[in-house]
Amino acid sequence: MLIKKILQFTAISFAAVSILVACSDGEAATTSNGEAVKKVKVAYDQSGKPMTYIDENGNPTGYDVEVMKLVDEILEDYEFEFVGTSNDDLLIGVEQGKYQVGVKNAFWTEERTAKFIFPQEFLGLSSAGLVVKKENAHIKNLSDFASAGFTLAPIAANNAQYTVIAEYNEANPDNQVKLQAGEEFSVDVVQWVNEGRVDGGVQIEGSFNGQVLTEGGPYHHLKDEIVYNEFAVIKTWPLFNKKEQEFADAYDKAIQQLKETDALNKLSEQFYGKDLFKVLDSVKR
């Protein structure tokens, strides 16, 4: 009799635990319609401030990251896990399927279309410019830079900034920028210019502001010696793994909803100090 009661108690306890686990799993893994939630890994370059970085509390943030958080809120069928990593690991990881999507202030290039899915809707806008010494502040664009015969900080061939300069050179064969492919993905442009190793370099405005104009930045002491001159505003994109077309399509629908509001404008102002969407009509790339 005692053994029978013990067996009955064990069976009841096991059933109760099973029900609790099932309920718990159901809440975490299904939508309000009872459909399964797809968990996806969103990689971000953790050193790409203000586009993608880790804040003082250890949380992922930046323009690209915050937009993807809004996308996550809209997409009930998906659950995002943000994974901070390096630029190289992001590119390799998304291509190989370690991550389903990656954000890193990425520009579109023909080469990248062979490795990643580019969605229909862009993620944001980024200001690209020339960093030069104050005495060369009259150099406003790539044409000025080329005409002056200035030397440019090297850019890795797989860096989309290299493609931007290469496209300019192709369109201007008689006034080309001296473009040198670097071994590293990017170099410390401000340092190279300040030391006189080159006459100028290409940098994203957000990065320049964080390094030079922001109090406490590593080169804030050079704020009166180094200048940034914007030469283009360029669309930026999330990079999806080649097998994630359905996910990319879902992203497109969510971003379309967000673009009908002022959410992206506000994030641009928050992280870049200005609403880059105001010049969207003049963006060529």
Language model features with spans:
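A ligand-binding cleft/hinge motif common to bilobed small-molecule-binding domains
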Residues: D89, E95, N105-K115, T163-E167, ...
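Extracytoplasmic small-molecule ligand-binding "clamshell" domains
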Residues: T31-A106, G182
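Periplasmic-binding protein-like
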Residues: D45-Q46, G124-V132, E215-D252, K274-R285
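Ligand-binding clefts/hinges and TM-proximal coupling segments of bilobed small-molecule sensing domains
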Residues: A28, Y78-E81, N158-Q180, K253-R285
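Extended ligand-binding regions for polar small-molecule ligands
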Residues: V65-L75, N136, S143-A146, F150-P154, ...
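C-terminal motif of bacterial Sec signal peptides marking the signal peptidase cleavage site
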Residues: I19-A22
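Acidic, polar ligand-binding/catalytic clefts
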Residues: E81-F145
